[in-house]
């Protein structure tokens, strides 16, 4: 499959909510979206939705590049509908800025999913209130820069503005020691 080609392929295996294999054996990563990694909050729902949408169906794959894992990064269409946008609109994948020809549509869909708290943006996967009153330390795992920071409740308004996105690998902790043992460092913006 050439990087610039626009062709139809049958989906033979769905790996997770944003990647799959086609009948040529090529692995495709959907452009402009980020679904939860396997085992994280919402990962099963994202994979199930993508499977329901495209498994065993012919999709149009419009690759733009290859990634560091040698996957084709592509806009994907089923019946002339953007699969990229359908995943974002469902709330089971986050919009991740891209050069997709559907970028504006995906950005709007992502904003709507977040505003309406659906999918990974629901209270199941995106939390500001701790599930246990004894475990109030917020741990943020920033995938983009590798920083894993924790915020104790005495952080004031900074603490109040932090969301624990379980779908991104964020966690709640019961003690600073527990956070540190999990590889998180205390943020410098808190006392």
Label each region the model flagged.
Residues 1-2, 111:
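Polybasic, low-complexity, intrinsically disordered segments
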Residues 2-100:
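Electropositive
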Residues 89, 94-98, 111-191:
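Mature, structured domains enriched in cysteine- and short glycine motifs
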Residues 46-50, 79, 83, 88, ...:
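Stable alpha-helical elements in mature extracytoplasmic
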């Amino acid at each position: 499959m050439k990087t610039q080609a626009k062709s139809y392929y049958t989906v033979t295996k769905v790996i997770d909510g944003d990647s799959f294999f086609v009948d040529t054996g090529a692995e495709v990563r959907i452009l402009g979206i980020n679904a939860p990694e396997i085992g994280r909050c919402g990962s099963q729902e994202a994979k199930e939705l993508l499977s329901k949408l495209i498994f065993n169906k012919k999709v149009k794959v419009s690759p733009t590049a290859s990634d560091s894992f040698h996957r084709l990064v592509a806009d994907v269409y089923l019946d002339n509908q953007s699969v990229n946008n359908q995943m974002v609109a469902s709330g089971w994948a986050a919009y991740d800025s891209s050069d997709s020809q559907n970028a504006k549509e995906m950005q709007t869909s992502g904003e709507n999913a977040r505003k309406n708290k659906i999918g990974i943006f629901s209270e199941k996967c995106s939390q500001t209130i701790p599930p246990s009153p004894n475990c109030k330390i917020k741990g943020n795992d920033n995938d983009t820069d590798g920083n894993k920071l924790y915020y104790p409740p005495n952080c004031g308004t900074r603490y109040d503005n932090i969301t624990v996105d379980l779908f991104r690998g964020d966690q709640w902790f019961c003690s600073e020691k527990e956070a540190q043992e999990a590889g998180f460092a205390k943020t410098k913006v808190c006392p």
